[in-house]
A protein has these predicted regions:
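Conserved ABC transporter NBD signature motif
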Residues: 58-70
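Conserved ABC ATPase signature
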Residues: 145-150, 154
């Protein structure tokens, strides 16, 4: 499903590479964890796979293939089709990733609105199911709340729901339990 071949990423404002020679393969249904010290390139590798790094600020070499489709040098329009539909991402800082002016429900539903022709009520029901799967209490009530009205752990769960709502092939998790309570982690 996912193949990374000799990935190198260097930011223009840094002396050394953020990622140096990463190669890995992930098959359907497989779970792989990247472990390393802070600054070792785990997040940059994940962001490269998701197509979320600013291309004008870094140089890439190598290949990233999702079901044989090249992602590293793909057009932004191709990446937009893949992001959310085939790749879901959960970041460690949900406060910086959620739109503070948009209620939680529409944010969880957003990938369905963009990538499917699903009717609004069906999108809403799918979002509620994803929120329940992420162990959000009272998903219906949380849909009408803004990000600032939720705790860090609740917001992290909402972000997990948004990442899984469209049932992506690949789920990238960058320290997804950082904001969760110890009992949930």
């Amino acid at each position: 499903m996912l193949e990374i071949q000799d990935l190198h990423v260097k930011f223009h404002n840094r002396d050394r590479e953020a990622v140096s020679g990463v190669s890995l393969t992930i098959q359907d249904g497989e779970i792989l964890g990247l472990v390393g010290e802070s600054g070792s390139g785990k997040s940059v590798t994940a962001m490269s796979v998701a197509g979320l790094l600013p291309r004008k600020q870094c140089d890439y070499t190598g290949r990233i293939l999702l079901d044989g489709q090249e992602l590293l040098h793909a057009d932004r329009s191709v990446l937009r089709e893949i992001q959310g539909a085939e790749i879901g991402v959960v970041f460690q800082e949900p406060q910086s990733c959620m739109d503070p002016l948009m209620k939680i429900g529409p944010q969880v539903e957003e990938t369905l609105r963009i990538h499917t022709q699903m009717p609004k009520e069906e999108r809403h029901q799918r979002a509620l199911a994803a929120m329940a799967a992420a162990e959000l209490p009272d998903p219906e009530g949380i849909c009408d709340k803004y990000p600032h009205e939720l705790s860090g752990g609740m917001l992290q769960r909402a972000m997990i729901a948004a990442a899984i709502v469209n049932r992506p092939k690949l789920l990238l998790l960058d320290e997804p339990t950082t904001a969760l309570d110890v009992t949930i982690q």
